[in-house]
Design a protein with these regions (language model features):
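Twin-arginine (Tat) signal peptide motif
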Residues: 1-8, 32
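N-terminal export signals
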Residues: 6-28
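A general lysine-centric signal
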Residues: 9, 138, 198-200
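C-terminal segment of N-terminal export signals and the immediately downstream linker at the start
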Residues: 22-58
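N-terminal amphipathic alpha-helix/helix-capping segment at the start of soluble metabolic enzymes
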Residues: 41-44, 63, 155-166
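Metal- or metallocofactor-binding catalytic centers and their adjacent structured scaffolds
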Residues: 42-45, 50, 66, 78-79, ...
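Short catalytic helix/loop segments, enriched in acidic residues and glycine
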Residues: 70-73
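Metal-dependent enolase-superfamily TIM-barrel catalytic cores that perform enediolate-based chemistry
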Residues: 157-238
């Protein structure tokens, strides 16, 4: 029985030149898309470009040990047959990766040696072999490649993988340490869009943070003190 990678490739080629969308083969229904597979067949080379940029945060982001207003990022674009997939490497300071380290890693990546973007396992194994670290840079290539293949197929990945998007696990929205007024505003901004909140603690206003959030919403709360709690009893009391 062919594996999913081979099935994806077979589905793509089987529908070339026909009036059937690959998404119909995968899911039995039409998925609106402005991207179409090259009807002359697939035989080009992938081209990867990347550039750094700075993501400006809406609010100051404060945890137990530091504050920041920006996050350094590197965007990765993989182009194939006129279709482009996008990925991103985000480098918060505690992960030890920088724009420079990501750029240096990406300069080593040569995707032009691959003529078939559907060879996901081979391509990503090659990327992983270039360094034992550099996980943010590798993730950016991984995301861009999957985005590219999804666009070539004209289907979202939950359809390609046969997943029910209604069963997607809930993710959290993080609220950084701040004054009561700002915490209240942050909570109101996200309370109707997320099912769980993650709250940064680890300073003198921990209880005030929780009380302020509880004055706005009763959503479940997960807490992250970022090594800010040094006393066991204090942690137990919280």
């Amino acid at each position: 029985m062919p594996n999913r990678r081979d099935f994806l490739k077979t589905a793509a080629f089987a529908t070339l030149g026909s009036g059937i969308a690959v998404s119909q083969v995968l899911a039995g229904e039409s998925i609106a898309s402005t991207i179409h597979i090259n009807k002359q067949g697939m035989g080009g080379k992938m081209k990867m470009t990347f550039f750094p940029y700075e993501l400006k945060l809406r609010h100051v982001f404060t945890v137990a040990t530091y504050s920041r207003t920006t996050t350094p990022d590197v965007q990765v674009e993989i182009e194939y047959e006129g279709v482009t997939g996008y990925g991103e490497a985000s480098m918060p300071p505690y992960l030890g990766e920088t724009v420079e380290s990501v750029m240096n890693f990406l300069k080593k990546v040569n995707l032009e040696q691959f003529s078939d973007p559907f060879q996901l396992e081979d391509i990503l194994s090659y990327v992983d072999s270039l360094s034992p670290k550099d996980t943010a840079a590798k993730a950016a290539v991984d995301i861009a490649l999957h985005d590219l293949v999804g666009k070539l197929l004209g289907a979202p990945w939950h359809k390609i993988w046969g997943l029910n998007k209604e069963k997607t696990p809930s993710t959290t929205f993080t609220i950084g340490i701040d004054t009561p007024d700002v915490v209240r505003a942050k909570t109101k901004e996200c309370a109707d869009r997320f099912n769980i909140l993650k709250v940064k603690l680890g300073r003198d206003n921990d209880k005030e943070m929780i009380e302020t959030i509880r004055s706005v919403t009763d959503l479940p709360i997960a807490i992250d003190a970022n090594q800010g709690w040094k006393d066991r009893q204090y942690a137990l009391d919280m």
